[in-house]
Amino acid sequence: MWNLRITPLSFGAACQGIFTSTLLLSCVTVPLVCTIVYDSCLYMDINASRALANVYDLPDDFFPKIDDLVRDAKDALEPYWKSDSIKKHVLIATHFVDLIEDFWQTTQGMHEIAESLRAVIPPTTTPVPPGYLIQHEEAEEIPLGDLFKHQEERIVSFQPDYPITARIHAHLKAYAKINEESLDRARRLLWWHYNCLLWGEAQVTNYISRLRTWLSTPEKYRGRDAPTIEAITRPIQVAQGGRKTTTGTRKPRGLEPRRRKVKTTVVYGRRRSKSRERRAPTPQRAGSPLPRSSSSHHRSPSPRK
């Protein structure tokens, strides 16, 4: 077992030195990247901006786990990395891949150390209630140098003689949770950008709109399965491919002779087609010339002869 002979003063100084770099990154860098740098570097149209804002309202279980998310993002970005692309989605997604990967490893390390300390915590020790641990919203309002002091004061107020190992465990759990909540925004932004590279910004915008509509519809009035982006984009891809592979056996519509419509009229109570030849009318008045017969079409001999 460990022989920890540390006074509260040295414990505080040591912990401040250990966690300063981690807290500096987790509490300052992540919010700045997700707000100042992101909002100033990225320009999108109004529809894409609204869809991106709606991403923050989607449930947590909609997004993949951190490990799967980073792996999928790297697969989507690899062709653009090889071609040295400078598209906005490539640049921002690359930044978030590095950010999430580094901070996720740090957070996982905190959890592993905390779990290893659990073995040396006295069995009768009561865990620190969540209300005594600093939350993410509170950490944004506390100066970075005072974060450890505020957390230590809360632990002392819970139990003045709280064991040293249990204090370290409580600090690690609090800071790891702050890191995870800080990375949640970056995780959603990374999902948005690498999917825009895979499917197109317009398709992702349409998909988010349909998904939110499905989520807001009561269960008995909506479909059983949520819409997927593959189902939205597949018909368009198939239609485009079909146009290229058609053999063209059918004549274009514009080159086909238009069939003349046969109009009919009613004459004296019977239907007659205008396209049919009309018969020569019989003389009805006195003095009208008699119609020539078909045999008299040739010219009569001149009377001079």
Curated annotation (Swiss-Prot):
Location, primary (coarse class): secreted
Segments crossing the lipid bilayer: none
GO cellular component: extracellular region
Signal peptide coordinates: 1-19
Keyword Signal on entry: yes
Protein keywords: Host-virus interaction, Secreted, Signal, Viral immunoevasion
Site (Cleavage): R272, S273
Assigned protein family: Belongs to the avihepadnavirus precore antigen family.
Assembly with partners or alone: Homodimerizes.
Name assigned to this protein: External core antigen
